[in-house]
């Protein structure tokens, strides 16, 4: 998330920087924006759900951002963002529907393809955790250019498989806003407007994982990585 935030903030003009930065996020984009904005000496405000993990809210504040909390079940972060934008004139940097965010996150894909080449790997299925699709679409673009035999597959938690279903139907599907998941960082209502055409063109069929599979993967990561 820091890659995308830093990329987007670096692309701002001096006039845009003077207006300050506004973002909305469940936690990771929030921290990326806060850190990148502080590094550029730009004030930032981040809209976060009140039920986001406390550590993410606290860290976002510690990294320098002002945090505005909202009720994700009864309020729209987009509407809150639009109102704050009109009031203060801040520049809104979306968590995935921003070309510079996608480009920044795509650098992870460039590193993956470069490291794979060094290891002699020229064909693989690349599984990418997916919410709105910023990271996944960025990696997919990088692979399409530099590792054409890599198959990028979005991976989503059960109950929030909007991208997987959207790739099947060919149109943007939505999730039930009343559901919950261990994977709070990738709980999004639907694929991004900018990201979905990229996902549709460059990604292969996605995968859906259960809460039990998520916990098992976390345990393996702690034990072996």
Region spans (language model):
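PLP-dependent amino-acid enzyme catalytic core
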Residues: 2-225
